[in-house]
Each structure stands twice: as structure tokens, then as C-alpha cells.
């Protein structure tokens, strides 16, 4: 039986329900760190199930940075207006705006990158590798690796999270899905910077 103090501590750290905290502590013999990991795995598994669900509610959130020199707007969607009004959802929208202001991504995910941009990037990489005397299959592997790096620079969901670079932006969205119990999607975003060329 999990001790109430441990349940309270785990609940404060994770925001999980009492029954989930109790289950996690019993499954990990009262080890708080393992219980947190247990809940994250369970939450992410639940989040994966919610990913395909339709999102028609949400908010438009804006953020102004550096004394008005950088501005970001995002449309963040969820399944119900109840979740859209929660502080956790609004905080996620703000975190995503901060990330966009900081990293200037061009696309939400790799699926949004136009094929002609991918081909252009491959051409640039091939040009950089043309003097290497490597077999074509090795060159293709190098191109794949460099394309992965490209996606990590230009796709919001693949960027390292600004508050914890061991995690990606997609991870904080999955955490929010697990916590709020609804699918969450980024519909679109735009970043403005004073003096920026279009």
C-alpha cells in the first residue's frame, strides 16, 4: 500500500490523479523517480491513443519579445473549449510561442516541408559531398543524416525544447495531451521580426 505522503509528493510533481499515483508507487515499490517515469510512460502511451482525434476548439495566442522587435502568433487546437480555457493549455501556447521566437522554425513538422525545399536541400548537400570518394550508398546515408539535421533546425516539433534540450517540442505537447486528456495540434504559426525581409 502506497503511503499518503508519497502519493501527495508524486501528485504535486506530476499532476496525475491520486489513483494513478497510487498505482505507480505500488508498481515501483515506492520509488518516486521510478514512479514519475512509470506515469510518463503510461501518460505518453495514453497520449499516443489520443493523437488521431479531431481538434476543432482552441485559442489564438500571441507573444511579443525584445521590446516589440519579435512577435509570434499561434493557433493551438484541442478537442473541447473546456480544455482550451485551462491555464495548462494557455501555458503550452505561450511556451510554443517562446520556442518559435527563439528558434525561428519555418514549418510545424517534416510533413509540412514542401518537396521542392527537400530536393533543394539534398542538392546543396550533394554539392558539399561531391569531392568525397565514397560509394553512392554511403553518400545517400550521409544525405539522410544531414536531412535529419535540417528537419531538426526548421521543424517546430523536432526542435530541442528551450527549457530542456534533452527533450523535443513534440514531447512537451505529448505531456500536455497526457495531462489534459485530449489531442492537441498546432494548426499554424507566424513569426514577425522588425526589419526582416519577406
Question: What is the predicted function of each stretch?
Answer:
Residues 2-198:
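N-terminal assembly/interaction segments in proteins that build large macromolecular machines
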